[in-house]
Swiss-Prot record:
GO terms for cellular component: AMPA glutamate receptor complex; glutamatergic synapse; postsynaptic density; postsynaptic density membrane. InterPro entries: CACNG_subunit, PMP22/EMP/MP20/Claudin, VDCC_g5su, VDCC_gsu. Belongs to the PMP-22/EMP/MP20 family. CACNG subfamily. This is Voltage-dependent calcium channel gamma-5 subunit. The lineage of its organism: Eukaryota, Metazoa, Chordata, Craniata, Vertebrata. The keyword Membrane applies. Keywords: Cell membrane, Membrane, Postsynaptic cell membrane, Synapse, Transmembrane, Transmembrane helix. The chain crosses the membrane at residues 8-28, 103-123, 129-149, 176-196. It comes from Homo sapiens.
Length: 275
């Protein structure tokens, strides 16, 4: 991958992370996940008379029609809900969606951590591991969010299946824009996570490709003597001695092996090397 493509992918992952975090924050804090309508069907003209209409989020229920029109109530997660405000079907729906509430919160927490690590990785590009860690957090955030969305949908569908149908009653529901924001956030978060992990793999592969072999740092002068490359290998010397001792030992070795070095066939043609 070229440097231009890598920069574009990095920028795109950052934009997806910011948009996903913003959309999920809006979705969690707003009250437009679900719209519910209840009423009766007039037998004469088969028209529908709306008795109650509301929209709900993860924390509140706001009424659009009925006796409590214009009022909002906090969803009680510990104490049982007041069944006098709505019908039994609506209360059961609001009770069952409680099981899905913790997952968007966990997803928002993971997404925030991934966003912070992603920004730190862009500020300090040599920390390539941060791109991988942020990608993992983004993927975990998306998985937690999709589990919450599936539980939210299944809770409503289960109540609709168990509800006794009556020809004279009207019950309708639809998902709101807060739910749509959460679903879009899932797609953006997963995309940002996959791109972050992909960038880490590309950077890691590039570092290994351009890293020289360790043998390149230890060339030998020639093959005619076992001691010809020793002076280029500091790790071959015995450690714990002073530089003067090392220099003296090297001089003694050169003097003791000088007759053997004269046997090198190229010695007469070389003036700067003993071989």
């Amino acid at each position: 991958m070229s440097a231009c493509g890598r920069k574009a992918l990095t920028l795109l992952s950052s934009v997806f992370a910011v948009c996903g975090l913003g959309l999920l924050g809006i979705a969690v804090s707003t009250d437009y996940w679900l719209y519910l309508e209840e009423g009766v069907i007039v037998p004469q003209n088969q028209s529908t008379e709306i008795k109650m209409s509301l929209h709900s989020g993860l924390w509140r229920v706001c009424f659009l029609a009925g006796e409590e029109r214009g009022r909002c109530f906090t969803i009680e997660y510990v104490m049982p809900m007041n069944t006098q405000l709505t019908s039994e079907s609506t209360v059961n729906v609001l009770k069952m969606i409680r099981s899905a509430t913790p997952f968007p919160l966990v997803s928002l927490f993971f997404m925030f951590i991934g966003f912070i690590l992603n920004n730190i990785g862009h500020i300090r590009p040599h920390r390539t591991i941060l791109a991988f860690v942020s990608g993992i957090f983004f993927i975990l955030s998306g998985l937690s969010l999709v589990v919450g969305l599936v539980l939210y949908i299944s809770s409503i569908n289960d109540e609709m299946l168990n509800r006794t149908k009556d020809a004279e009653t009207y019950f309708n529901y639809k998902y709101g824009w807060s739910f749509a924001f959460a679903a879009i956030s899932f797609l953006l978060t997963e995309s940002a996570g996959v791109m972050s992990v992909y960038l880490f793999m590309k950077r890691y592969t590039a570092e290994d490709m351009y890293r020289p072999h360790p043998g390149f740092y230890r060339p030998r002068l020639s093959n005619c003597s076992d001691y010809s490359g020793q002076f280029l290998h500091p790790d071959a010397w015995v450690r714990g001695r002073s530089p003067s001792d090392i220099s003296s030992e090297a001089s003694l070795q050169m003097n003791s092996n000088y007759p053997a070095l004269l046997k090198c066939p190229d010695y007469d043609q070389m003036s700067s090397s003993p071989c």
